[in-house]
Amino acid sequence: MNQLEFVKLHGNGNDFILIDELNGERIPEDEKSEASRILCHRNFGIGGDGVLFLVPSERADIGMRLFQPDGSEAEMCGNGIRCLAKHAWESGYVGERFSVETLAGVIPIQVRRDRKGFWARVEMGIPRFERSEIPADGEGTFLKVPLHGFEVSAVNTGVPHAVIFVENLDIPVEQIAPKIRHSSCFPEGANVNFVRLGNHLEVRTFERGVEAETLSCGTGSVAAAAVARRLGLVGETVEVMTKGGPLRISFAGEKAFMEGPAVTVCRGVVSDEILQTLQ
């Protein structure tokens, strides 16, 4: 493997290592999973909540693939796609309006920059509430279902999410969430969101694949807003506050939109010592 350049970015503290493969594969397909496990390690690697691969696409302007710290590939990531959009736009690959192919489908994006920094508005598609589309066991919708002592609702916003409304967010998320994340109700597992309703939504998310709480989750924020809207708790636009900062979630008809920032942290080259472990 030749020299491997990377870019480190974050969206509200949800941090990613980006590998640009638009002009050629940098990490072979059969090594991407293990490479992501190594690169994401916060002690022995670069550290991150996932590795983003910017790749060519025949269906959209560019493509995105995301491998998580456990080596699994995720269908979609809301914070990750904003980071990828920032790199693609600043590299001159795309204009202010473009589309990104993901495993969850083709995602339209609009980007801008103001005095506060870079922002991306992402069309997140129509949240899917049918159990067959989440997926979850059974038929119909999965709303306010008793599970492990909580009322759990579930929705797919690119990836499956469980949403739980609580009065107090000061709870041991990493002790409680794995029981729901691995519940037999969800054959592919689920991300788990604990949500407090106030003037805005406050969300803490335990992410599948990261297997830990992250500072922010874009698809989780959309899931929280979508379930709250479905239950009549919020209107067409809502601010979602994560530990890493706010996201603006809005709806036009049934389509959901997410708007938020992305920040470039650094650029670098993976050391020869780490490269040797990838070969």
Swiss-Prot record:
Pfam families: DAP_epimerase. InterPro entries: DAP_epimerase_DapF. GO terms for molecular function: diaminopimelate epimerase activity. One of its GO terms (cellular component) is cytosol. One of its GO terms (biological process) is lysine biosynthetic process via diaminopimelate. Keywords: Amino-acid biosynthesis, Cytoplasm, Isomerase, Lysine biosynthesis. Its main location: cytoplasm. The record marks H161, E207 as: Could be important to modulate the pK values of the two catalytic cysteine residues. The active site is at C77 (proton donor), C217 (proton acceptor). Pathway: Amino-acid biosynthesis; L-lysine biosynthesis via DAP pathway; DL-2,6-diaminopimelate from LL-2,6-diaminopimelate: step 1/1. It is found in: Cytoplasm. It comes from the Archaea. It catalyses: (2S,6S)-2,6-diaminopimelate = meso-2,6-diaminopimelate. Belongs to the diaminopimelate epimerase family. Catalyzes the stereoinversion of LL-2,6-diaminopimelate (L,L-DAP) to meso-diaminopimelate (meso-DAP), a precursor of L-lysine. This is Diaminopimelate epimerase. The lineage of its organism: Archaea, Methanobacteriati, Methanobacteriota, Stenosarchaea group, Methanomicrobia. The gene is dapF.
